[in-house]
A protein has these predicted regions:
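Fe-S ferredoxin-like electron-transfer domains
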Residues: 1-136, 140-144, 152
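Low-complexity, intrinsically disordered regions enriched in charged/polar residues
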Residues: 15-18, 147, 180, 203
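Cofactor-/ligand-binding subdomain signature composed of acidic, glycine-rich
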Residues: 34-40, 44, 154-215
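Short beta-strand elements
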Residues: 144-148, 158
Length: 216
């Protein structure tokens, strides 16, 4: 029944390769559809917040995002409207999904109904390499997975650690990797001399930093 009104968007869907419904369909489904009736059309590419897009034709009405927003973040802005096969996920008309943990709903969505504007159409997941790391956005030290290809980072997602960040991370931390692309980012150590800075080698920089930190 999940596939009755579900569009065959796998070739263009960002969730392809890590979609639970796709895996179930491949493992248990038939090679072709037996559904002859016309599928119900629902809203697509809906901006429900500054960082997220919604495709209601892919939504399976699991309510994970609704419960996360209400129970974890205490930002009750998502819900279902209409009935039967016309039931759709939507956002509060006067309040977008804009809290700093909104992108976690993309992680817990089992299909491609919720997608991140930042990662949308950037790279297929099977081409990327995942590396375990720690978020450097703040002092909390959230455990993360860095998804990259050919020395370019495409996204950062939370890695479960119940002692630190559980299974979540803030949107600010997810976007923090863009600082690596900043044009003014330092690529070599520099030392201030008078009113200017001059380049120094790494051993000298490490020695100076060690001496400075040893005072504390």
């Amino acid at each position: 029944f999940l596939l009755i009104n579900h569009r065959l968007d796998c070739p263009i869907c960002d969730q392809a390769g890590e979609c639970t419904l796709q895996e179930y369909s491949v493992e248990h489904g038939k090679g072709e559809s037996r559904f002859l009736e016309q599928k119900v059309k629902k809203p697509k590419n809906v901006k429900i917040g500054p960082r997220i897009r919604l495709d209601d034709e892919r939504c399976v009405l699991c309510s994970r995002c609704v419960r996360f927003s209400k129970e974890i973040v205490d930002d009750d802005v998502l819900g279902f409207v209409d009935r039967g096969s016309h039931n759709v996920l939507t956002v509060h008309p006067d309040k977008p999904l804009a809290n700093n943990y909104s992108l976690n709903t993309v992680d817990i969505c089992p299909v491609g109904a919720l997608t991140s504007n930042d990662f949308r159409f950037q790279m297929r997941v099977w081409f990327m390499r995942e590396t375990k790391s720690i978020c450097t956005g703040c002092a909390r030290g959230c455990n993360i997975l860095i998804s990259s290809r050919e020395n370019k980072i495409y996204r950062q997602t939370p890695r479960e650690n119940n002692e630190v960040n559980s299974a979540w991370m803030c949107d600010s931390g997810r976007m923090h990797y863009h600082t690596l692309e900043a044009k003014r980012r330092l690529t070599d150590p520099m030392m201030k001399r008078g009113k200017s800075h001059e380049l120094i080698d790494w051993p000298t920089a490490i020695l100076k930093a060690t001496k400075g930190l040893s005072k504390f």
